[in-house]
Design a protein with these regions (language model features):
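Polar, enzyme-active/binding microenvironments
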Residues: 2-4, 10-321
Length: 321
């Protein structure tokens, strides 16, 4: 069996899991796995009040974000993932008198088309501050707060609107965590479950079941963000007791503790992150409009990318084409 990518034919007859050919992740069924793309979207957040703003950037080109459209309901602390075509924004917190509430709303957009979001379906439970990742087919939403921290993982088929289904449980209940994937494994790191957590869990995205311990972040923290390429997952920002500019990384296919990657340009509580599988961008956080970027395969400090259209804390981000 062979597969041609970028005009190069490659023998993959003996491949299992995810392999990489010319920067493209390829699954065991010999098809490209796409969970990201060139356009990065940032949706929702807290500007002092809840925001419904979605803005976008071209990840390979530094510059300020442009308006994309609006979420169906203004909220902060949702989570987002994509299949490279559709972007989903699920969960979050809708402030309202007197205390507000977590939500189970899932919205979707077609990433290539500027427009307002449309209702997709509902999570199995309301989730404030969940994290999300994808393998290009299934989108997982894990953790969150619904009165108390929860360990629930839900999943949806991204290309098919409908309500989420139970996937399994995280190893520890927490919210304000972050997630990424390499197209096969999904990692959920950090969060708050009564104290800051350094836990990294992992799941095989195509197989329902409970998460397994992966290792530890370099610093326990909450409301951080994560993105990845096909090899490395990076976790940036968050609150360790004070707001942080920490970036650490792991090799997603190899369990173990995270290693220092570098620093964001500014401390960020509640940023959001996405990637084009080469560059990772971290936008917003600490009611800032700053977007930073890194080259995911090269540990180093982040560089200024540009600005969001609206400064805000705890948006969610995904990417596609």
């Amino acid at each position: 069996m062979s597969l041609t990518i970028n005009h190069q034919t490659n023998d993959i007859s003996n491949s299992t899991g995810t392999i990489t050919i010319n920067g493209v992740a390829v699954g065991g069924d010999n098809t490209p796995i796409i969970w990201s793309g060139n356009r990065g979207l940032f949706g929702g957040g807290d500007t002092g009040s809840a925001s419904n703003v979605i803005d976008y950037v071209t990840i390979a080109t530094t510059g300020n974000a442009t308006d994309f459209g609006d979420l169906t309901v203004a909220r902060h602390s949702p989570a987002a993932c994509s299949d490279g075509i559709y972007g989903l924004f699920g969960g979050g917190f809708i402030p309202a008198d007197p205390t507000g509430s977590a939500t189970n709303v899932i919205d979707y957009v077609t990433i290539a088309t500027l427009a307002n979001a449309t209702d997709f379906g509902d999570l199995t439970v309301a989730q404030y501050g969940p994290a999300a990742c994808s393998n290009g087919t299934y989108g997982l939403f894990g953790g969150g707060l619904d009165g108390s921290a929860i360990n629930v993982i839900n999943y949806v088929t991204i290309a098919t609107t409908g309500n989420a289904t139970d996937f399994g449980d995280l190893t520890a209940a927490r919210y304000g965590l972050a997630a990424c994937s390499n197209g096969t494994y999904g990692l959920f790191g950090g969060g708050w479950g009564g104290s800051n957590s350094n836990i990294i869990d992992y799941v095989t995205i195509s197989t329902t079941g409970n998460a397994t311990d992966f290792g530890d972040l370099t610093a326990a923290r909450r409301f951080l963000a994560s993105c990845s390429d096909v090899t490395y997952g990076i976790f940036g920002g968050g609150n360790t007791g004070s707001n942080s500019n920490i970036i650490d990384y792991v090799t997603i296919s190899t369990t173990g503790n995270a290693t220092d990657f570098g620093d964001l340009t500014v401390v960020k509580y509640g940023p959001a992150a996405c990637s084009d599988l080469t560059y990772g961008i971290f936008g917003g956080g600490s009611t800032s409009n700053v977007i930073d970027y890194v080259t995911i395969a090269t540990p180093a400090n982040a560089t200024d990318f540009g600005d969001l259209t609206v400064a805000r804390t705890s948006p969610a981000a995904c990417s596609g084409d």
